[in-house]
């Protein structure tokens, strides 16, 4: 059994999506970051960086009978869960795996931080900072363009197969309105976004942590 410590953010929903895709049993523990619950001593024991999401796998890395394993950082969690279950969401073929890793790191190092800043400065900001709004809006649109170009000849980010790179990126792109982005400008991204929304695991994962209330 996996315990998922999460909240309704793009990062949190990456992990609930992959758990649904893999059909793994999991318990949801809501960590209300608006109330600062990520800073409690209890949460610190499972996430040393005081960030959601994190998981505790009571079956451990070797399957049933192993020691409980705590993990934080979404990229690491996605790879761990895919490898634990021997899923092709993180391909076994070396070239495909490296392509997946490359685009996963692109999300972790670019999309997440830049879209996060776009959210902060453009979506109901407590203070309007025009320079920051222009900078992060411009960078967000650049990243959408990168995605659009990549998927001109590919069904998904890392090629023709759905992978952890798509799972990691989707919840951020789903907030495109907060970036003041019109997806019709990026038709390949729009097609990809609509297609992923049709996946049952994505629909269910995007409702966590509230769907089970």
What feature does the model see in each segment?
Residues 45, 91, 169, 198, ...:
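Phosphate-coordinating loops and pocket residues in cytosolic domains that bind phosphorylated ligands
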Residues 202-213:
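Terminal-tail/helix-coil boundary detector
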Residues 33-34, 165, 210-211:
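Conserved beta-strand edge residues that scaffold enzyme active sites
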Residues 1-134:
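GST-like domain detector, emphasizing the conserved glutathione-binding G-site
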Residues 27, 90, 159, 184, ...:
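A local structural micro-motif
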Residues 81, 107-200:
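GST-like fold's C-terminal all-alpha helical module
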